[in-house]
Amino acid sequence: MSMVYANIFLAFIMSLMGLLMYRSHLMSSLLCLEGMMLSLFVMMTVTILNNHFTLASMAPIILLVFAACEAALGLSLLVMVSNTYGTDYVQNLNLLQC
């Protein structure tokens, strides 16, 4: 494994550890998810460019579309929760309430 792949994999693992450790605020969870998506995008792009996969060149673009949708939904959830509860603590959320 080259150093580029190792660094990208390390960035993904650090984002995953941040997501698992800092679960108290919704904003920090969203930032860790964005870090994971960014490292996946870079890993896919580097792999496709190194292996000359011309048919799979659309996959990173599709991943970016899903990441943008995830970010938009996450930010709208953050705004809704902060307007309703006045804070962005994850433990205040009860998913059983309507």
Swiss-Prot record:
Protein name: NADH-ubiquinone oxidoreductase chain 4L
GO function term, MF aspect, one: NADH dehydrogenase (ubiquinone) activity
Gene transcribed to yield this protein: MT-ND4L
Localization annotation: Mitochondrion inner membrane
GO biological process: ATP synthesis coupled electron transport
InterPro entries the record matches: NADH_UbQ_OxRdtase_chain4L/K (IPR001133), NUOK/Mnh_C1-like (IPR039428)
Its membrane topology: Multi-pass membrane protein
Residues spanning the membrane: 1-21, 29-49, 61-81
